[in-house]
């Protein structure tokens, strides 16, 4: 589709090249599911969905159902954003979004969909949405969690161990976690 001329645009935004950015947050954390966020910088519109923690627990984890669910979530988010015909779709290079990239290319056309490193507001808003999700569980994340990933993991683990019923909020499918989840 040809880009409209300035004279044919009803708003400045209509003539501006728009971009959708898709990011994830929480994949490497022990608690909750994973947030998939979508952000359009030109309008500052942000939306997200959560891939439930059940996808990171057996038996779904072994089947890698989280990859298919991430693709479904990404497709729903893009569709609800009503992208223009030539609007670029940038997707985080995270492994969890690999299937999403392929599905988006099939649905919206390969040249429009690019795998990139997501930074800035898209990343910040997706991370903030994830932090809100874990706070809803009653967990208070450490302030410097990004800089101190190992400390953050063990802080989450101690929180789970204080109350065995919290285990239902943990991503127990990761093989390396099994050695830490013992009660």
What are these regions (language model features)?
Residues 2-183:
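RNase H-like, Mg2+-dependent phosphodiesterase core
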């Amino acid at each position: 589709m040809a880009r409209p001329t300035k004279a044919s645009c009803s708003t400045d935004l209509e003539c501006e090249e728009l971009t959708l950015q898709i990011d994830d947050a929480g994949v490497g954390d022990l608690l909750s599911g994973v947030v998939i966020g979508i952000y359009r910088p030109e309008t500052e519109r942000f939306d997200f969905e959560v891939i439930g923690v059940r996808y990171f627990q057996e038996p779904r984890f072994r089947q890698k159902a989280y990859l298919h669910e991430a693709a479904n979530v990404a497709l729903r988010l893009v569709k609800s954003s009503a992208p223009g015909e030539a609007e670029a779709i940038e997707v985080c290079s995270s492994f969890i979004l690999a299937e999403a990239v392929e599905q988006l290319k099939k649905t919206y056309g390969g040249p429009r969909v690019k795998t990139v490193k997501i930074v800035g507001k898209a990343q910040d808003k997706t991370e903030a949405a994830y932090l809100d999700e874990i706070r809803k569980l009653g967990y208070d994340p450490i302030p410097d969690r990004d800089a101190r990933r190992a400390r953050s993991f063990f802080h989450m683990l101690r929180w789970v161990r204080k109350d065995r019923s919290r285990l239902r909020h943990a991503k127990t499918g990761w093989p390396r976690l099994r050695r830490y989840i013992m009660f």
